[in-house]
Amino acid sequence: YLLSSKPKEKVSVYANTWSEKCPNNITLGQRAVSLMSDGYQGIKIYPLQNRSLSQAKECVAHIRNLIGFETPLMLDLASPDDESLALSLAPLIKEYRPYWYEEPVDGQKIRSLASIRIQTGLKIVTGEKQFEIPHFKEVLAASAADILNPDIAGVGGIIDMTEITNLSAKKGVTISPHCWNSMSVAAAAMIHFCISN
């Protein structure tokens, strides 16, 4: 109870498919279905990884058809160098109702994130590569994200993560802690259970 007087009893978890390990949509789909059978409540894919825009749309459609519309489908664009890709892809995949649109551009490009958020109407996720509280304050002030995913190992630990969480809650922004390694997973899991947003 050091972090919260009302910790959650359970949290939802999603599976990262690591799309680069799946050479085609069929293999990726099989992985997604397998992960769902393991009990994960959502699936994250990287539709632009080694794919054109039209192929990315086919990928999203294929996975959505396999997992259904009740299961959250997260899209990670992995910060493409070409900022126009996020805007070009959005109308192609909107009908598949992605739960979020992660790293449509580099997280340092706060104005671009805010613009993409407005233009696409999709829930923007950013923050995994950023590490200072002032950056997150700037993202929040610009209304550039719906969900922040700071990495507990990158932002300075539990205290700074808690500060980012509190700042986000005041703006109605959700937190989905990012994890690089097992120690981060353990610390992030503790945060998940203790934060309200």
Residue ranges and their predicted role:
Residues 16-20, 46-50, 72, 76-82, ...:
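Active-site beta-loop-alpha junctions enriched in small/polar residues
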Residues 91, 97, 108-125, 130-197:
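Shared catalytic-loop signature of beta/alpha-barrel
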